[in-house]
Regions:
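Short coil/linker segments at helix-helix boundaries
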Residues: 48-168, 172, 176, 181-189, ...
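Structural recognition of alpha-solenoid helical scaffolds
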Residues: 18, 22, 150-157, 193, ...
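Bacterial Sec-dependent N-terminal signal peptides
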Residues: 1-19
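Acidic, serine/threonine- and glycine-rich low-complexity intrinsically disordered segments
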Residues: 179-247
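Alpha-helical, heptad-rich or low-complexity scaffold/stalk segments
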Residues: 29-32, 38-51, 55
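Short N-terminal segments immediately surrounding and downstream of signal-peptide cleavage
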Residues: 13-31
Length: 247
């Protein structure tokens, strides 16, 4: 087992009050009679909300050593033994996230986010990007940069949620990752994300019964059909297998 080195505890490096103040300032700016008419104000709001979404898991990734985790995120509030996908794991518990580590190597296996700085951060960022582009298409390059960063983070979170067994939430995360890339023309939508969302929603539907199952299967079907209408097809054709199960 890897050696645990836990010096005097310090909090996860997320300054919640500071981040909330940034969001409040961005909200106030777009509500201002003059500043709200500027696309740049909406770009800034999109950036603030995207950054707040990303921050709690910004330094995480599978295979990162515990020592690097502690250096970048801080020391955990505590640690305990658990399991990850049925295998032994050591959990480093932080304010915003529980990080699962391989006991043999000390490498990150996965994580589960427990808190968000604010609700609907990614969705608000996407809405703000769309508003900014509507007001001034010349802001496209700035918007595209935010959209790509946010989409990558959402897809990574989708993987993390799926690894923890949160299938429906993972599906939504992949769908939002796809939507982030549809705001401006220069970001090419990743239909793999849409396929992942449909696949996960179909898997989730199979665990339900009655009207809930019907609604979830219908949602999966819609996602698959949207992907197919764009000309998308996964490498081995599994999209048709999952689509069949939606009927």
């Amino acid at each position: 087992m890897f050696a645990l080195a836990l010096p005097a505890a310090n909090a996860q490096k997320v300054a919640t009050a500071k981040e909330l103040a940034k969001l409040e300032k961005a909200d106030a700016t777009v509500l201002d009679a003059k500043k709200g008419l500027k696309a740049s104000s909406w770009v800034a709001r999109a950036n603030a909300y995207a950054n707040a979404y990303i921050l709690p898991t910004k330094e995480l990734g599978q295979g990162i050593p515990a020592q690097v985790l502690q250096m970048n995120v801080g020391n955990p509030e505590g640690s305990y033994e658990s399991t990850f996908q049925g295998m032994p794991s050591i959990v480093f518990s932080y304010e915003y996230v529980d990080v699962y580590l391989d006991p043999a190597t000390g490498f990150i296996q996965g994580w589960e986010q427990k808190l968000a700085i604010k609700e609907n951060l990614a969705e608000t960022a996407i809405e703000s990007m769309a508003k900014a582009y509507e007001m001034d298409p010349k802001q496209e390059s700035k918007i595209a940069s935010i959209a790509l960063t946010l989409s990558n983070a959402l897809a990574q979170q989708g993987d993390a949620l799926n690894n923890m067994g949160h299938t429906a939430e993972a599906a939504q995360s992949f769908l939002t990752a796809f939507q982030a890339l549809t705001v401006v023309p220069s970001t090419t939508p990743n239909f793999d994300y849409l396929y992942n969302a449909g696949m996960l929603m179909t898997m989730y539907a199979s665990t339900l019964q009655g009207d809930e199952a019907v609604a979830a299967f219908n949602a999966g079907e819609q996602l698959f059909n949207t992907a197919l209408a764009s000309g998308y097809e996964d490498a081995v054709g599994n999209i048709y297998y999952f689509l069949f199960h939606c009927y």
